[in-house]
Amino acid sequence: MGKISSLPTQLFKICLCDFLKIKIHIMSSSHLFYLALCLLTFTSSATAGPETLCGAELVDALQFVCGPRGFYFNKPTGYGSSIRRAPQTGIVDECCFRSCDLRRLEMYCAPLKPTKSARSIRAQRHTDMPKTQKEVHLKNTSRGSAGNKTYRM
């Protein structure tokens, strides 16, 4: 014997089906077209593979992500490394031939440059101090000058 469902459950199913039939009948054909278009858009974007960045699009994306820091096409390596490494892959290999995300793009950004802070007077060397007019004149006279004057050897 088959399973007998309760009366309230059957009534709910009938009412729901009738409600949906009325709603679909009331909807105009343009509404149905837009609904189908939305469903098609969502399903096609869900099945589409990840996009790749090549050429000018890759450069534009790097400029946007890295900003004024700039970027490298190959990953920067440490200095003084004498160990032979396998050939490096660059941003083109990682983002043009395969898809990459924002974190992968950020790996190719140049490091932030430290901001130049104002040096204190104590930290300045004596050669950084401006020379007075008298000091400049004394140095020039000790070396001699052009014309009839003699030069020191």
UniProtKB/Swiss-Prot annotation:
It is found in: Secreted. Residues 119-153 form a propeptide. One of its GO terms (biological process) is response to nicotine. Residues 111-118 are annotated as: D. One of its GO terms (molecular function) is transmembrane receptor protein tyrosine kinase activator activity. It comes from the Eukaryota. Forms a ternary complex with IGFR1 and ITGAV:ITGB3. Forms a ternary complex with IGFR1 and ITGA6:ITGB4. Forms a ternary complex with IGFBP3 and ALS. This is Insulin-like growth factor 1. The lineage of its organism: Eukaryota, Metazoa, Chordata, Craniata, Vertebrata.
